[in-house]
């Protein structure tokens, strides 16, 4: 019979051991939460007027991103909370020297701290880890969280900027008379004195560095608004500050360098000849390229009217300058294609644009042709003009018969007279008038040809002068635009390069909020 009872009780002993025995932790939990009648809705104080001290610390694991367009800072942190709840204390000897209990956070009282300046509607932590309870009633809670906080972006010096973001914690349930928010205090082993942890804790082994932002200052501070009553929930808060500086290399390579190179291409417009027809095409192409970059920058930054980013100032400066280049191209092309039949060049204009400015701008000038031996004839004329003049002189001293048979005599080998025939002056004058009347149509035709050639040369010379004026204006614009572009570029970007973060976290406060400069209590 005994073995029958054993076979019946053995499965029960295996599968239901709790029916016959209870662990020390279970007895302790039952004693604290059931027998004592623990109520998590009540503050852990013996008297109503007492204040619960809640210490807070923040450990930064990763600065994930800062989205300028949304003005949102995303961080991965560990929120460290600690307080005392004497209702949960116990005698370690009674419970087999158990010194720590781990319970879910919804079983105990919490100070209900929230992130005030969140930007996504999530006020609490992401994961509710267990709360550690010590035998003396000390409560320690270290939940992880990924916070998205609102961060006001100062775009003045983008991309050579620095930002001051913060994580502000407060309790919207309890006022300053009910809970006292304070920074965590650690013990200085050398002096055996406590000091507040007035900075964000960064574990070098667990911290992941951000590729765009560099952390400069990480102070932590308790803020008290003296203008409010301690009974207000906004009277006190603990704020952790992140002063970060942008690493501009990404923007220099991908935005600034292309912008500067494309802007310098605007100077090539002045080297293109006007006859090529590509001056306007190149200038407008540069203008459109800068417009595309300005559009890309506007999508990256917040829509604000309080400040203009540094890169936007530069792009606007270049766009205005390229617009001036386009206008100068229009003027140069207008001057280049002018003709004497539509426009006349004044003497003052010739003096300025053909003599003075070319010498100042060190422009090469065409060599002046040497004048011909006779006056009254155009410098650039046909050689036939000289023959006509010589013919008139020749006919005036030769008799008509000599003129008729001179060529035949030369053809048959006869020599002509060395001296001209002497004729009666009266007969000579009559003969000359008769000869002039016969050759007058030929002389008129020759004069017409000379006049036509002279007019054509004058026309071409005037047109060449317009070409030279257009070239002078083109060179003048080059000498004006290039220095303005270089000086403006250096002035804008050097102003951003000297925009350094502050040497101290708070203006007027000489304290450096680091562990090396901790303040002992």
From Swiss-Prot:
Residues 336-475 are cytoplasmic. The modification Phosphotyrosine is found at residue 394. It catalyses: K(+)(in) = K(+)(out); Na(+)(in) = Na(+)(out). One of its GO terms (biological process) is membrane depolarization. Residues 22-247 are extracellular. GO terms for molecular function: acetylcholine receptor activity; acetylcholine-gated monoatomic cation-selective channel activity. Pfam families: Neur_chan_LBD, Neur_chan_memb. CDD domains: LGIC_ECD_nAChR_D (cd19028), LGIC_TM_nAChR (cd19064). Disulfide bonds join 151-165. Glycans are attached at residues 53, 164. It is a multi-pass membrane protein. It comes from the Eukaryota. The chain crosses the membrane at residues 248-272, 280-297, 314-335, 476-494. Its main location: membrane. One of its GO terms (cellular component) is synapse. Keywords: Cell membrane, Disulfide bond, Glycoprotein, Ion channel, Ion transport, Ligand-gated ion channel, Membrane, Phosphoprotein, Postsynaptic cell membrane, Receptor, Signal, Synapse, Transmembrane, Transmembrane helix, Transport. Residues 1-21 form the signal peptide. It is found in: Postsynaptic cell membrane; Cell membrane. InterPro entries: Neur_chan_lig-bd (IPR006202), Neur_chan_lig-bd_sf (IPR036734), Neur_channel (IPR006201), Neuro-gated_channel_TM_sf (IPR036719), Neuro_actylchol_rec (IPR038050), Neurotrans-gated_channel_TM (IPR006029), Neurotransmitter_ion_chnl_CS (IPR018000), Nicotinic_acetylcholine_rcpt (IPR002394). Pentamer of two alpha chains, and one each of the beta, delta, and gamma (in immature muscle) or epsilon (in mature muscle) chains. After binding acetylcholine, the AChR responds by an extensive change in conformation that affects all subunits and leads to opening of an ion-conducting channel across the plasma membrane. Belongs to the ligand-gated ion channel (TC 1.A.9) family. Acetylcholine receptor (TC 1.A.9.1) subfamily. This is Acetylcholine receptor subunit delta. The lineage of its organism: Eukaryota, Metazoa, Chordata, Craniata, Vertebrata.
């Amino acid at each position: 019979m005994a073995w029958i009872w054993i076979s019946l009780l053995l499965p029960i002993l295996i599968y239901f051991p709790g029916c016959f025995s209870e662990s020390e932790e279970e007895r302790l939990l039952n004693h604290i939460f059931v027998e004592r009648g623990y109520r998590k809705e009540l503050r852990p104080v013996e008297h109503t007027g007492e204040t619960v001290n809640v210490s807070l610390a923040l450990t930064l694991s990763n600065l994930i991103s800062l989205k300028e367009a949304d003005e949102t800072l995303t961080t991965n942190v560990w929120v460290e909370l600690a307080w005392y709840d004497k209702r949960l204390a116990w005698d370690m000897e009674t419970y087999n020297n158990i010194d720590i209990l781990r319970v879910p956070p919804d079983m105990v009282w919490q100070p209900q701290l929230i992130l005030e300046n969140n930007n996504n509607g999530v006020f609490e932590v992401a994961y509710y880890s267990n709360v550690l309870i010590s035998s003396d009633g000390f409560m320690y809670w270290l939940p992880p969280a990924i916070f998205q906080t609102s961060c006001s972006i100062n775009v003045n010096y983008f991309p050579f900027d620095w930002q001051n973001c913060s994580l502000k914690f407060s309790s919207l349930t309890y006022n300053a008379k009910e809970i006292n928010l304070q920074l965590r205090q650690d013990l200085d082993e050398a002096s055996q004195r406590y000091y507040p942890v007035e900075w964000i804790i960064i574990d070098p082994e667990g911290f992941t560095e951000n590729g765009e932002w560099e952390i400069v200052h990480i102070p932590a501070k308790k803020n008290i608004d003296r203008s409010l009553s301690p009974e207000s929930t906004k009277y006190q808060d603990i704020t952790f500050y992140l002063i970060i500086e942008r690493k501009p290399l990404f923007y220099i390579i991908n935005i600034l360098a292309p912008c500067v190179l494309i802007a310098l291409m605007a100077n090539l417009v002045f080297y293109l000849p006007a006859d090529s027809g590509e001056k306007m095409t190149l200038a407008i192409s540069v203008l459109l390229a800068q417009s595309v970059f300005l559009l890309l920058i506007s999508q990256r930054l917040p829509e604000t009217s309080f400040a203009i980013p540094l890169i936007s100032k530069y792009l606007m400066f270049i766009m205005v300058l390229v617009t001036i280049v386009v206008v100068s191209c229009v003027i140069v092309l207008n001057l280049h294609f002018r003709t004497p039949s539509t426009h006349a060049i004044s003497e003052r204009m010739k003096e300025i644009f053909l003599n003075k400015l070319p010498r100042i701008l060190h422009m090469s000038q065409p060599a002046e042709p040497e004048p011909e031996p006779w006056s009254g004839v155009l410098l650039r004329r046909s050689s036939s003009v000289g023959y006509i003049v010589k013919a008139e002189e020749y006919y005036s001293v030769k008799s008509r018969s000599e003129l008729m048979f001179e060529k035949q005599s030369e053809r048959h080998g006869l020599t002509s007279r060395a001296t001209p025939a002497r004729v009666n002056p009266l007969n000579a004058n009559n003969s000359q008038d008769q000869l002039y009347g016969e050759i007058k149509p030929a002389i008129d035709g020759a004069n017409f040809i000379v006049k036509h050639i002279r007019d054509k040369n004058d026309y071409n010379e005037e047109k060449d002068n317009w070409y030279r004026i257009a070239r002078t204006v083109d060179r003048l614009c080059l000498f004006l635009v290039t220095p303005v572009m270089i000086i403006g570029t250096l002035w804008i970007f050097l102003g951003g390069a000297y925009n350094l973060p502050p040497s101290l976290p708070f203006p007027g406060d000489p304290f450096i909020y680091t562990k090396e400069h901790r303040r002992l209590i």
